[in-house]
């Protein structure tokens, strides 16, 4: 694909580089040279790579987070109420049913995320 760049009437074709031109042998060697030392260090010191012996510094805030963002909290109720209101207003403005379906999608998304996070 050639793009044409014109300067005061004269045109000169400019070739656009392909995305795959970045995956040359030299670039792959540079990547390997950067990744292999880090991989070797992680192999010899796995406790540093995985933080196996670390303590959870955020454990004391679990009760506060569950009280603020849990299933029965007011924050979730306000988010759902705001979604209903915004969806209704957008439907009235555009007459597009997708905005009404957005309420159901957001509600399901919030329920799934709460279950995954453990709230």
Swiss-Prot record:
Similarity comment text for this entry: Belongs to the TraA family.
Function: Propilin is the precursor of the pilus subunit, pilin, that forms conjugative pili, the filamentous surface appendages required for cell-to-cell contact during the earlier stages of bacterial conjugation, and that retract after contact is established. Mature pilin is assembled with the help of TraQ and TraX.
Sites bearing N-acetylalanine, chain numbering: 52
Organism: Escherichia coli
Gene Ontology terms: cellular component: extracellular region; plasma membrane
Pfam families given in the database record: TraA
Membrane topology, Periplasmic segments: 1-73
Assembly, per entry: Monomer. Interacts with itself to form filaments; also interacts with TraQ.
Protein name as catalogued: Pilin
InterPro entries assigned to the protein according to its UniProt record, in alphabetical order: TraA
Topology versus the membrane: Multi-pass membrane protein
Cell location: Cell inner membrane; Secreted
Record topology, Cytoplasmic segments: 95-98
Keyword vocabulary terms for this entry: Acetylation, Cell inner membrane, Cell membrane, Conjugation, Membrane, Plasmid, Secreted, Transmembrane, Transmembrane helix
Main localization (coarse): membrane
Listed transmembrane segments: 74-94, 99-119
Propeptide span(s): 1-51
């Amino acid at each position: 694909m050639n793009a044409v760049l014109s300067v005061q009437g004269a045109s000169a074709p400019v070739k656009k580089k392909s995305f795959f031109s970045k995956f040359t042998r030299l670039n792959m060697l540079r990547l390997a040279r950067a990744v292999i030392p880090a991989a070797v260090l992680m192999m010899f010191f796995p406790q540093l790579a995985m933080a196996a012996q670390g303590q959870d510094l955020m454990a004391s805030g679990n009760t506060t987070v569950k009280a603020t963002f849990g299933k029965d909290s007011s924050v979730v109720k306000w988010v759902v109420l705001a979604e209903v209101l915004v969806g209704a207003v957008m439907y009235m403005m555009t007459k597009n049913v997708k905005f009404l379906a957005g309420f159901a999608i957001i509600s399901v998304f919030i329920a799934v995320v709460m279950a995954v996070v453990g709230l």
